């Protein structure tokens, strides 16, 4: 690979097989590839792989202060939190349009800490051009995070179980690690995984992770996460869930018991909408 935006897509060879059979054949800008420091083997649905360089100097997002990709512009580094005055070219609260290069995900939010109104944009297989931001984001973005997008299938496991032919897994906690074959999706089981800056830094540091799961059965006031710290109150849970927005990851709602979607989750969602 000579260009850090180039990729090789194999539709029917899984990441582990690519790593084991072909790893030694790849070079990055003339040097032998080193996994995971200079090369990535990302999932491509159930049976494929996207191979590309791992380069922290890559700038897959170009932002503009005018609509239709016009006006002053700035390049945003991958795997970096750009917020407030650290957004280049003095474009804090001035973003109106952007180009996101294929294979990447960008999270934009209005508050410098990542909370408040936000939106995740995904350029899965083609560059994404947004010529006009949604009204609530236009000239209001104060934090940006761009990370590699990983295209997993629907097949997953609850638990780090080998040999299940899945492309992602979770463990009801935030202690897991992705491997070459699977993306690990951390869960904030309860309040303890969402109440301080160390939690946020932990989630941000997860290699290959694009999502974070909300709380485990917070609707159960007598069991699971809902029995602790008044988490079965949807408003209380919403406050800690908001803290997870600081990760810049794509967020998944809390997982309630059967029937919670019509009651607890609905109430939780209404609080989230009210609070942006």
Where are these regions (language model features)?
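A general structural motif
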Residues: 5, 23, 152, 166, ...
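Active-site-proximal beta-strand/loop segments in catalytic clefts of secreted hydrolases
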Residues: 66-67, 111-112, 157-162, 170-175, ...
């Amino acid at each position: 690979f000579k260009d850090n935006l180039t990729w090789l897509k194999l539709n029917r060879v899984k990441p582990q097989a690519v790593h084991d059979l072909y790893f030694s054949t790849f070079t990055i800008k003339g040097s032998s590839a080193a996994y995971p420091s200079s090369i990535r083997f990302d999932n491509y649905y159930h049976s494929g792989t996207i191979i590309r360089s791992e380069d922290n100097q890559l700038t897959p997002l170009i932002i503009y202060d005018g609509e239709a990709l016009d006006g002053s512009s700035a390049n945003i580094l991958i795997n970096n939190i750009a917020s407030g005055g650290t957004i280049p070219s003095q474009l804090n609260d001035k973003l109106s349009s952007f180009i996101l290069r294929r294979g990447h995900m960008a999270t934009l939010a209005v508050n410098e800490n990542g909370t408040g109104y936000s939106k995740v944009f995904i350029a899965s297989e083609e560059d994404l051009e947004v010529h006009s931001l949604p009204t609530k984001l236009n000239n209001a973005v104060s934090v940006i995070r761009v990370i590699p997008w990983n295209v997993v299938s629907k097949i997953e496991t609850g638990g780090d179980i080998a040999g299940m032919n899945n492309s992602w897994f979770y463990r009801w906690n935030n202690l897991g690690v992705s491997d070459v074959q699977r993306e690990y999706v951390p869960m904030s089981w309860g309040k303890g995984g969402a109440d301080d800056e160390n939690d946020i830094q932990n989630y941000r540091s997860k290699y290959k992770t694009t999502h974070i799961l909300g709380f485990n059965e917070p609707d159960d006031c007598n069991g699971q996460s809902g029995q602790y710290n008044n988490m079965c109150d949807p408003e209380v849970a919403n406050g800690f869930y908001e803290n997870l927005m600081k990760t810049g990851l794509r967020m998944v709602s809390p997982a309630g018991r059967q029937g919670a979607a019509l009651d607890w989750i609905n109430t939780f969602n209404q609080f989230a909408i009210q609070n942006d």
